[in-house]
């Protein structure tokens, strides 16, 4: 069946293609949680699945699908590639190819020896081992623990509030010339109403600079100067939509840097290999290559930094002619910046796919990074979180180690076959897997805990 349009809106054609080409390994016993994980993986478009089975004394229950492959096939968008193997036998095969998997998902692993062996294999493979999502559910509680082997880069974070890259404090010559074509002193109110608010904000910044303000611009300063340059046209100006927008978005002019600085800090302070064979995920390597390319461009031109303009302009009150002229300036500048990146890549003989390059340049401000944790798969054994400790005790020793004070709080730990919570975690862990595969949205960093008794959740870094 065809994928829903919603999926393409969430992570785009590039993300969906990554899902279609990915391979996911699910490790664990036959539980409703594992069934939910498989179902959600197939519905997302992942059609290459491996199940490393763990024998478990606990019955899978009547809700578990009798023939997993047969029941999953109708949900798949193409021929389902599916294999089952025994985990213990697989762990004893030194040549087993773990690197072929995009993500490894552990579901309700209750054997300490299996976890220890898998952790040792992961340590030996180093950065070539895929990301691991370890999840466990008991009663009304559960956790998801992400362990990365290499730095994970998010190509498009999709923040809740979109911040446009307008370069109000760092305009290029063509944009300055465009702003200078508007002489407010010779305008009437009708002509003024057709000016984009970004032009008004840049005129305010220019006036502040002429007045000797070389420090950080504040919102109050912007609003005060806006009144100084606009009110001479008449008191009715304050009712014009573009003036109202300029007041509302005055804060956009108060940022020295329109794009996030954390990526520059990463490149400045972090030593990570730019050798392709050291990376498990090609996209991570390509995004790193692009970040290093930006650094090289800045160095070659004696600039503090170089950030490609995204070229996206928000809707605003303006005449059609003024808006189209402004939009074209941003689009032309974005193409020029992208060309500079392509030329630098060619000189360095680095290869990056065109789709990744275009997405990177058009959403540079949304690029994020997550560093591998200092802990490994065994990190869940050495925390001071009472709920996680209780879950781990149930998972590996089948007995919660809780104090008298915690006994009432964790009363829901021993509820068997809580399918609703397992279904929730099946969706949640696959959501994190999709984030890792598509490089869209920011994954958890790196522990997610859920308490179904009081309906609360939290993330921690361990």
Swiss-Prot record:
One GO term (biological process): protein neddylation
GO cellular component: cytoplasm; ubiquitin activating enzyme complex
InterPro entries according to UniProt: APP-BP1, ThiF/MoeB/HesA, Ubiquitin-activating_enz
Keyword line: ATP-binding, Nucleotide-binding, Ubl conjugation pathway
GO molecular function: ATP binding; NEDD8 activating enzyme activity
Cysteines joined through disulfide linkages: none
Pathway stated in the Swiss-Prot or TrEMBL entry: Protein modification; protein neddylation
Subunit structure: Heterodimer of UBA3 and ULA1. The complex binds NEDD8 and UBC12.
Similarity comment: Belongs to the ubiquitin-activating E1 family. ULA1 subfamily.
Function recorded in the entry: Regulatory subunit of the dimeric UBA3-ULA1 E1 enzyme. E1 activates NEDD8/RUB1 by first adenylating its C-terminal glycine residue with ATP, thereafter linking this residue to the side chain of the catalytic cysteine, yielding a NEDD8-UBA3 thioester and free AMP. E1 finally transfers NEDD8 to the catalytic cysteine of UBC12.
Listed name of the protein: NEDD8-activating enzyme E1 regulatory subunit
């Amino acid at each position: 069946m065809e994928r829903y349009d919603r999926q393409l809106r969430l992570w785009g054609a590039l993300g969906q293609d990554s899902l279609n080409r990915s391979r996911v390994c699910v490790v664990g016993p036959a539980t409703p949680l594992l069934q939910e994980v498989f179902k959600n993986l197939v519905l997302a478009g992942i059609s290459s699945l491996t199940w490393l089975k763990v024998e478990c004394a606990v019955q899978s229950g009547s809700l578990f699908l009798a023939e997993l492959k047969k029941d999953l096939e109708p949900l798949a968008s193409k021929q389902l590639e599916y294999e089952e193997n025994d985990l213990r036998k697989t762990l004893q095969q030194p040549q087993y190819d773990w690197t072929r998997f995009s993500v490894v998902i552990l579901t309700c692993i209750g054997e300490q020896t299996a976890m220890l062996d898998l952790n040792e294999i992961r340590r030996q493979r180093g950065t070539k081992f895929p990301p691991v999502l370890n999840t466990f559910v008991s009663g009304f509680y559960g956790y998801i623990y992400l362990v990365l082997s290499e730095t994970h880069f998010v190509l498009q974070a999709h923040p809740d509030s979109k911040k446009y890259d307008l370069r109000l404090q760092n305009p290029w010559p063509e944009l300055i010339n465009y702003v200078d074509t508007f002489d407010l002193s010779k305008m009437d109110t009708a002509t003024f109403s057709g000016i984009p608010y970004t032009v008004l904000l840049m005129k305010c910044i220019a006036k502040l600079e002429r007045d000797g303000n070389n420090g950080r611009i504040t919102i109050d300063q912007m609003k005060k100067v806006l009144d100084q340059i606009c009110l001479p046209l008449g008191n009715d100006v304050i009712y014009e939509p573009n003036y109202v927008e300029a007041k509302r978005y005055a804060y956009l002019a108060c940022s020295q840097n329109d794009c996030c600085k954390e990526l520059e800090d990463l490149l400045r302070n972090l030593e990570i290999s730019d050798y392709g064979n050291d990376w498990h995920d090609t996209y991570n390597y390509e995004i790193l290559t692009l970040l290093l390319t930006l650094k090289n461009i800045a160095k070659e031109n004696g600039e503090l930094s170089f950030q490609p303009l995204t070229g996206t302009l928000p809707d605003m009150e303006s005449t059609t002619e003024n808006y189209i002229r402004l939009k074209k300036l941003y689009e032309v500048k974005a193409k020029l910046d992208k060309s500079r990146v392509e030329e630098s890549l060619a000189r360095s003989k680095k290869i990056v796919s065109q789709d990744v390059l275009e997405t990177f340049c058009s959403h540079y401000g949304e690029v994020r990074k997550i560093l591998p944790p200092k802990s490994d798969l065994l990190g869940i054994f050495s925390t001071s979180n009472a709920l996680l400790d209780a879950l781990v005790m149930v998972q590996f020793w089948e007995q919660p180690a809780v104090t008298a004070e915690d006994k009432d709080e964790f009363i829901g730990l021993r509820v068997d076959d809580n399918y609703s919570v397992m279904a929730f975690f099946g969706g949640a862990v696959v959501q994190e897997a999709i984030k890792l595969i598509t490089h869209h949205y920011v994954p958890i960093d790196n522990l997610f805990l859920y308490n179904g008794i009081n309906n609360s959740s939290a993330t921690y870094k361990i």
